[in-house]
Regions:
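Anion (oxyanion) recognition and catalysis
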Residues: 40-41, 99, 221
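Short, high-confidence coil segments that cap the C-terminus of an alpha-helix
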Residues: 74, 102-103, 225
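Active-site-proximal specificity loops/subdomain of glycosyltransferases
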Residues: 25-75
Length: 264
């Protein structure tokens, strides 16, 4: 668990990235859903949007733009997906937790868009490839902002037969902030996905994938970054007029049903 002490800062300068998809109008920008238009109430911000259907390329365009602006004194990089409806001043909420803990990355918990209450936040064992996603029921058994150590303390492991030291926190890129004034930011090679078709034990073809957010999480862990996940910024994940929210324990699944195919 991290400190709850707020951090007062006058030099906060956030590059806020908005990856967009061609032809898609973000629901958060419609009348009555304008909360995302004031992400911060302090410091300076530089806003940038991309418009590309290639997800990782879109992210990398924005990260590159931020890197090229880094000399102007950027302190943080943040990102909001076009289907996320966050609270007012969500950037400040995340930055306060980030600074209070001296962590490198903080990511909001985002439920998947169905009635199960499964999130894309979880734990992964990088030796065995086992993944366990956290459900909204489990999220509310953890501190409001938590680390991989908090997850293990709650008895949750990606691989019950593995070594907890080989596990790391996997987080989402829907609504997140990172420190941008630390040396690691210049070393990050960019976002990517890992996709393949392979033959399973029964001789059948199967498609497997590791998403860009989970691969970023792996890179962060391998490079010694401190990563946090949080539900402190109460948000909605928008789909067809409905918000799948992260501010209560809900869903038909108490635990991950284990449907994610491991990739090693």
């Amino acid at each position: 668990m991290i400190s709850e002490a707020p951090v007062e800062t006058c030099n906060q300068f956030v590059f806020l990235a908005f990856p967009r998809r061609p032809g898609w109008k973000p629901k958060g920008e419609q009348p009555g859903q304008v909360l995302c238009t004031r992400p911060s109430g302090r410091g300076k911000m530089k806003l940038a949007a991309s418009n590309n259907s290639l997800l990782c390329f879109s992210f990398n365009l924005l990260w590159s733009a931020a890197m090229n602006h880094r000399a102007a004194g950027l302190t943080h990089f943040g990102m909001q997906h076009d289907d996320i409806i966050p609270p007012l001043e969500w950037v400040d909420i995340l930055v306060d937790d980030l600074e209070a803990s001296s962590a490198d990355v903080i990511s909001s918990v985002v439920p998947i868009k169905d009635d199960r209450g499964i999130t894309s936040t979880g734990v992964r064992n990088w030796l065995t490839g086992e993944i366990r996603r956290l459900t909204m029921h489990e999220i509310f058994q953890l501190p409001e902002t938590f680390t991989i150590e908090d997850v293990h303390a709650a008895g949750i492991n990606a691989d019950p037969n593995g070594n907890p030291a080989d596990e790391y926190l996997i987080v989402n890129t829907g609504l997140w902030v990172c420190r941008f004034d630390r040396p690691w930011a210049k070393k990050f090679p960019g976002f990517r996905t890992q996709d393949q078709v392979r033959i399973d034990a029964d001789g059948r073809c199967e498609a497997v994938s590791l998403s860009e957010d989970w691969l970023f999480s792996e890179w962060a862990a391998r490079n010694g970054l401190s990563v946090l996940a949080t539900r402190k910024a109460a948000l909605g994940h928008w789909q067809d007029g409905k918000e799948y929210r992260n501010d209560s324990a809900w869903g038909t699944c108490q635990t991950d049903p284990g449907e994610v195919v491991k990739v090693t």
